[in-house]
Regions:
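Hydrophobic alpha-helical connector segments
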Residues: 51, 65-91
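Short linear capping/connector segments at secondary-structure termini
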Residues: 98-106
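Hydrophobic alpha-helical segments that form the core
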Residues: 136-158, 168-180
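Short hydrophobic/aromatic patch on the recognition helix
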Residues: 33-42
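C-terminal peripheral helix-coil segments that are non-catalytic and often amphipathic
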Residues: 120, 124-131, 161-185
Length: 185
């Protein structure tokens, strides 16, 4: 990716995080380029939003992979992955508002859902914890997956609305998630 393209995407993220309806003119101004230059790299607003979404997915995947690899204990892996997803989600929350979160069946059927995929690793941890009876076996994995996503969204929303401090939101999210799935640490 060229430096100008990266700069435009960063400017778009900054603008849209504050105001989803900011104009491309405002994004160009924030990036320090002309609108014409912006259109050399992005054909329209939707193209720019797609690029922001892809950037978010790449960064979130990277952060969650790092969180996964940072620990050997599966519970600490899940906790760190939750925190990484909250951090990345907070940085790109406008994307979540513009694109609906995928359902479990859509995620599971995608080609990207391979053995190296961070979601696959997360799901494997959940299945293993369930087999070990460390989490409630009455809950299905799709339910737990959607619950995980909902807790991330709730954490982000609570911080954005000013109801909860950013650091507290992570503690509350982890307490909520482990309680909801009956996690035995």
């Amino acid at each position: 990716m060229t430096d100008v393209r990266i700069k435009i995407i960063a400017a778009a993220v900054k603008c849209f995080l504050v105001n989803e309806s900011d104009t491309l003119e405002k994004v160009a101004q924030e990036a320090g380029v002309s609108r014409r230059t912006l259109h050399r790299y992005f054909k329209d607003r939707q193209d720019l939003l797609e690029s922001c979404k892809n950037e978010m997915l790449d960064r979130c995947n990277k952060a969650m992979t790092e969180a996964y690899e940072s620990e050997n204990d599966p519970i600490k892996k899940v906790k760190n992955m939750l925190f990484a997803a909250i951090e990345q989600g907070a940085n790109y929350s406008f994307i979540k508002r513009l694109y609906e979160r995928s359902s479990f069946s859509e995620v599971e059927s995608r080609k990207e859902f391979g053995s190296n995929n961070v979601k696959s690793k997360w799901l494997t941890i959940m299945k293993n914890l369930q087999k070990e009876r460390r989490i409630n076996d009455e809950l299905t994995i799709p339910w737990i997956f959607n619950l995980f996503g909902s807790i991330i969204e709730t954490s982000i929303y609570a911080v954005e609305s000013g109801d909860v401090a950013r650091n507290d939101s992570k503690t509350f999210a982890w307490t909520s998630f482990k309680g909801a799935i009956g996690l035995k640490e």
